[in-house]
């Protein structure tokens, strides 16, 4: 059998080396396979690699990795982590997708790897790390990627997202899953830096552990680790407006803003406040919302707390429906005259101890929806929806690893374009994709880049902005050898984002003597 198969293999190999003639719609083309050329579809990765090298964060991540092999034939931890990072950058959602970058020798050289390892090597490497050592390693790396940017007042957003599962994974339980009811899932309790849309931590739990009480311990731990970089406001939706979360913030003296569930007592409060005349005026600035302030002590609360009730008049031509006893869906307001005269209101009740005016509270809470855009990007444009294994341990590592690469890439994109944030769907074609061909001569490597994007001028401008940031850090490091380069880089980028601060008003001049 082996003798019969050998000629077939030889014929296939010979055919792959022959010149092929292809008749295309644009004419005749000659095609030849070239598996030895140093080429990459991610030519601009070299600029991102320089960004990481100047800050030293990738080296720090690799050096702190608890992976240790005893076999001399095993892959190095730098190769494993570099392969995982490259796969995440390229948009991989599963371990098998890493095979798509396996032959990228140019990327391997840019990241200082001996070679790109297989997806099985990545799986086995993550499994070889004990949870008690990998947990603090990844938490520290994730917090380090953001912490030095928290010198200005910032908002901590709390939220959880559902990760549907399609296999027999550990912790795959049927719980709250609004998009795919009945589908087993995991839950990612996530802690965001508001507006910057950066991840401070992500904790993976089973599908039934979706409530806020499963995020209490991670929140306490995160606030302890932040120390003097604590947020100016802790913000969350209705799942976090309970005594436990409020008590955590109040014990630390942190302002908070949470939405309340519309329980019976909350509805009674709405009915009582509806008749009051001191509602704020609806305007374009408030997006049609009116607000009023009061206090309430709900069941289970240790004290009465300040609440802000928001209401907005709903648009006309709204159809109300109801179900009959037989389950038939009917209109609750069948007559047009009744429907036209009805005034329908939408209500939101917020609990807060923040010392802000009523008019500002509503917009401050509406800004929270920006973290939903972060979830959408991480799940659909990065790898948070995938990289699933039978054990939760590796899924937790990859969830934090994806968030870490996402944070690094976000800083890189903001260095390139400080004026606006770009999601991966637009930033990758601009700042990662380019056909690169490497040539080596006399110990020097030259990379020729051919961008496929139409805005080549914009790309060059953005790369120049990145080089300006790197040049700033290098010049500062020459004068201060002990400088924290990553902290200096983040301060530079944040300064570019917010713009120059206003100069303080000089004190009045003293009167002349005599």
Feature map (PLM): residue ranges:
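An anionic, glycine-rich sequence signature occurring as long contiguous blocks
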Residues: 3-4, 15-31, 255-374, 380, ...
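Flexible loop/turn segments at secondary-structure boundaries
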Residues: 106-108, 163-165, 198, 209, ...
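Short amphipathic alpha-helical "interface-anchor" segments enriched in bulky aromatics
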Residues: 51, 98, 288, 358-401, ...
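Acidic/histidine-rich, metal-coordinating catalytic segments
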Residues: 231-241
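Short, solvent-exposed helix-loop connector elements
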Residues: 65-72, 358-365, 381-397, 412-425, ...
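Dynamic "connector" segments at or just before major functional cores
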Residues: 1-225, 249, 436-514
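Short, surface-exposed basic-aromatic patches at helix termini and helix-loop junctions that form
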Residues: 227, 246-255
